[in-house]
């Protein structure tokens, strides 16, 4: 895509494929979220999907639930074959906090082993695993204590992140702390259409700040390690393109 105007905005009406030049070594990949593909989760989104609006209608259209989703938890080997057939070399997936730590302080080793097995299967297929530590979902115990509304709760996310890192560091070199914090904040605390369904701009700002603090603390906890230089740690951003009424694109 080319910038077509002096100001920084895109002309979405045309993508000039011939003008796109990806550098040598550019890594093509695909990504998923645990709740959206694994199935059988028990988190804030599971609760949200089972809830109702004030008028008694289902929170989700038609009362739909993710339920088993596409059963990636059990069919990941088939999915890896599809990824390989697509021709990409990187797969970013999130680890489901509610499965790994269903009760505060109690870690399920079988869930951790599942993600080890996933990483091993990816590497055997020549695909680089990239792990996202938080992709919109919280275990219910964390949600019930206010999740990222309270800065004091960040320590639980850091503890979880360190446990996962120690378990998967032999297989994963690229780590993402939080997926799209602006989406989590705007949809859950500004628009109120995602859990926890609040519409409070001031609280939204506080949550956004705490997510960035959480990212920083996890980054520091992982990079301060003696082997920290061997790992890349970043955050996943979402970009909202905004066009003013006076500069609408034709």
Say what each PLM segment does.
Residues 2-60, 103-104, 112-250:
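Active-site region of glycoside hydrolase catalytic domains
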């Amino acid at each position: 895509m080319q910038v077509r105007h002096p100001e920084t905005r895109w002309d979405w009406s045309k993508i000039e494929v011939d003008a796109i030049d990806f550098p040598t070594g550019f890594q093509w990949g695909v990504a998923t979220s645990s709740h959206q593909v694994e199935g059988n989760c028990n988190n804030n989104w599971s609760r949200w999907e089972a809830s109702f609006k004030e008028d008694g209608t289902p929170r989700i259209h038609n009362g739909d639930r993710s339920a088993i989703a596409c059963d990636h938890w059990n069919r990941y080997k088939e999915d890896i074959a599809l990824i390989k057939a697509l021709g990409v070399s990187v797969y970013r997936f999130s680890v489901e906090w509610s499965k790994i730590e269903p009760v505060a302080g109690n870690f399920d080793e079988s869930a951790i082993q599942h993600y080890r097995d996933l990483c091993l299967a990816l590497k055997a297929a020549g695909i680089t695993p990239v792990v996202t530590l938080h992709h919109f979902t919280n275990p219910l115990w964390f949600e019930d204590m206010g999740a990222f509304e309270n800065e004091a709760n960040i320590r639980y996310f850091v503890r979880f992140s360190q446990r996962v890192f120690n378990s998967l560091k032999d297989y994963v070199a690229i780590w993402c702390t939080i997926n799209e914090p602006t989406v989590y904040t705007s949809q859950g605390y500004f628009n109120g259409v995602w859990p926890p369904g609040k519409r409070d701009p001031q609280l939204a700002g506080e949550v956004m700040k705490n997510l960035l603090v959480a990212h920083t603390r996890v980054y520091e906890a992982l990079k301060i390690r003696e082997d920290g230089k061997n790992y890349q740690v970043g955050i996943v951003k979402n970009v909202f393109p905004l066009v003013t009424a006076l500069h609408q694109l034709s």
